[in-house]
Amino acid sequence: MKRGRHIMKDLFEKAVAESKELTQRPSNETLLVMYGLYKQATEGDNENDPPSNPFDFVSKAKYEAWLGQKGKTREEAMAEYVELVNKLKG
């Protein structure tokens, strides 16, 4: 099982690097999904308090994107992130 996790982590790290080299910028909605999956994969469930500034829409959107991934294992989030980046690469 450890080997599978190590392989997934390598694939995830490769996908993170590739996401920075996409030829077309993904939509804001897709970027938020990527952000949520990345945070879930690297930190696990979002246990933070929501942003306190009601006018900080970017932080609120990021918070909610991560919160939307709650319950997924880190490996599941990594796999979904890899799949999404591969799809975006075409």
Task: Kindly label every feature range from the protein language model.
Residues 3, 7-90:
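A charge-rich, low-complexity, intrinsically flexible signal that marks solvent-exposed coils, linkers
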